[in-house]
């Protein structure tokens, strides 16, 4: 009987811990989720520890450094990358056009004024993009240069 009560007590504590953790995650707002740079920026509003009547903004910046990343990710023979540069303003910019209604007119606008067409340096593969490279293939004594997929799942349809 004691084991039965102990089991239910532990189960209740576990369920409460899971619900509290899930509740904290739900309050976070994702500001940026850049898979190319391996960065995720979130924020949430929490009560101030000094003054319970005030709220403060807490920001979480998660950066995953791909240790074996190459200078040119499409070229496996390029040297290993040793310098990683992150600009928060670049990570959080939203350049996709959005339709906004102004004075009963629908206008297309961008949420950032620093958008340019320069392709950003990627530190990891974007799994939704097809990366290829030309490599030498020797078969039957002959060497040919062939195009190969570095991310086959995104290069070939199902």
UniProtKB/Swiss-Prot annotation:
One of its GO terms (cellular component) is pentameric IgM immunoglobulin complex. Disulfide bonds join 36-122, 95-115, 130-155. N-glycosylated. N-glycans attached to Asn-72 varies from truncated, differentially fucosylated to sialylated (NeuGc) complex types: Man3GlcNAc2; GlcNAc2Man3GlcNAc2(Fuc); Gal1GlcNAc1Man3GlcNAc2; GlcNAc2Man3GlcNAc2; GlcNAc1Man3GlcNAc2; GlcNAc1Man2GlcNAc2 and NeuGc1Gal1GlcNAc2Man3GlcNAc2. It holds the Pfam family Ig_J_chain. One of its GO terms (molecular function) is immunoglobulin receptor binding. GO terms for biological process: humoral immune response. Transmembrane segments: none annotated. Keywords: Disulfide bond, Glycoprotein, Secreted, Signal. Glycans are attached at residue 72. InterPro entries: Ig_J. It comes from the Eukaryota. It is found in: Secreted. Residues 1-22 form the signal peptide. Part of the secretory IgA (sIgA) complex that consists of two, four or five IgA monomers, and two additional non-Ig polypeptides, namely the JCHAIN and the secretory component (the proteolytic product of PIGR). Part of the secretory IgM (sIgM) complex that consist of five IgM monomers, and two additional non-Ig polypeptides, namely the JCHAIN and the secretory component (the proteolytic product of PIGR). JCHAIN-containing IgM interacts (via CH4 domain) with FCRM (via Ig-like domain). Serves to link two monomer units of either IgM or IgA. In the case of IgM, the J chain-joined dimer is a nucleating unit for the IgM pentamer, and in the case of IgA it induces dimers and/or larger polymers. It also helps to bind these immunoglobulins to secretory component. This is Immunoglobulin J chain. It comes from Equus asinus. The lineage of its organism: Eukaryota, Metazoa, Chordata, Craniata, Vertebrata.
């Amino acid at each position: 009987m004691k084991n039965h009560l102990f089991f239910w007590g532990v189960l209740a504590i576990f369920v409460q811990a899971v619900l509290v953790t899930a509740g904290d995650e739900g309050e976070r707002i994702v500001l940026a989720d850049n898979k190319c740079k391996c960065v995720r920026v979130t924020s949430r509003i929490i009560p101030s520890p000094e003054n319970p009547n005030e709220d403060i903004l807490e920001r979480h910046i998660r950066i995953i450094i791909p240790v074996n990343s190459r200078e040119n990710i499409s070229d496996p023979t390029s040297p290993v990358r040793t310098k990683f540069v992150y600009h928060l303003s670049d990570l959080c910019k939203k350049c996709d056009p959005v339709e906004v209604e102004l004075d009963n007119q629908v206008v297309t606008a961008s949420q950032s004024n620093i958008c340019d067409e320069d392709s950003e340096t990627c530190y990891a593969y974007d799994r939704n993009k097809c990366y290829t490279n030309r490599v030498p293939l020797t078969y039957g004594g002959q060497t040919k240069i062939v195009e190969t997929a570095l991310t086959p799942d995104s290069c070939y349809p199902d």
